[in-house]
Amino acid sequence: MAGKASGKAVDRLAVVDETQADRQTIEVYELVTRKVRVGRVPLLFKALAAEKALMPCWAALRPAIRVRAFEEAADDLRAKAARLAVDLGCPLIETQLEWAGYDVDEIDQIRGQVDIFHYVDAKLLMAVCVLAEALSGGVGGVARGPRGEQRVPRGVPHDMDPIELVPEDANGTLAKVFRSIRMHLGLGLVPDDFRALGRWPKYLDLAWADARKRDDEPVARAALNELGRSADDAAAQLPVRVEIQEAALRAAGADPARVRALLQRFRRALPGLILDLALFKVQLDGAESARESPFPIRWKYISSDEYTTVGLDEPVKLRAGDPKNLDEDGGLPHRTH
C-alpha cells in the first residue's frame, strides 16, 4: 500500500552507493548497518549522503536509534501495520506461489527477504520522523526510566538472510513492475525491498498487483495516515533528545531546505512501504506471525553491564579491581619482552 505519488514524472532520488563513498562515509555506513541491524545500508542513509547531510544526521540520530524505546516503537508500528493489513483483507498466497512454480525452498527464501524489510521499514519511518522533527526544534527527551534507555544489541541478527539485489534495469514482467514502483513511491527508483524480491519475478508481480487493488479504498488511505501519525507520536516520546542545527548541516555542505524536502519524500513513501510489507507477510504467514518482530531481541538474556546506558554526565561506577586510569595495569601480568 505504498504511498501513491502523483502521475507526473518523478525525479530520481540521488544516492551514494558503497562503491562511490569516501572512507568517512563508509565508516558511517558500517555503523548504520550495525545499529539498524540490517545487512545492507538502507536507502535513506545513502540519500542523506548524497545531500552531504549523513554525518550531522547520523550523529544526532545514533543515540536515539540504539535504545530499547526506539526498537519497541518500531515493533509497535509493525504490529499496527499487520492489524491494518488484515483489516484491508489479504488472502494467503502460498498456494498461488506453488501454482506459479515455486518450490518450498524458494518460498522460504522469499519469506526470508519479506522478513528483513518487514522488520527494517518500521525502523526507517521512525528514523525519518525523528530527523524531520530534529530539524524543526528538536524531538524526544521524555523520561522513560532505565528500561527504555537500555541499549539495543549491535549487529545483524544471526538468522537474517543475506540481501541480494537484482539490477534496476530489468526486462520483461519485472521491468513493468519496477516502472510502477518508481512512479508509485515518488522516489524515482526501486527500493531495496523490491529489488531483493525481484529475484522471484512472478511472486513480486502477484504481490505488488494485489497490494495496488486497495490503494483507492478510504480504509487504505486512513491506514497510511494512522501509521504516519503513530510514528510521529512515538518519536516525540523517545527518552533521547534529538536536535539538528541548520548550522551543522551547512558546515557539512548540506542545504537544510533540500534535507527537509528529502525527509518529506521518505515520510510520504515509508508508511506505504510498511503496509505493503505487512500485507506480504500476512499473505505468507498469517496475521499472528506478522504482528511479531521477525528478529526479536531477547532482552532478559542481555547482560545489563554491556547494554545499560550510562549518561554522559554521570560518574561511571567501577567494580572492585577495575583500573582507575591508563597507568594502572588492573592486575594483569606484565608481558615478557
Where do the model's predicted regions map?
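Hydrophobic alpha-helical segments
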Residues: M1-H337
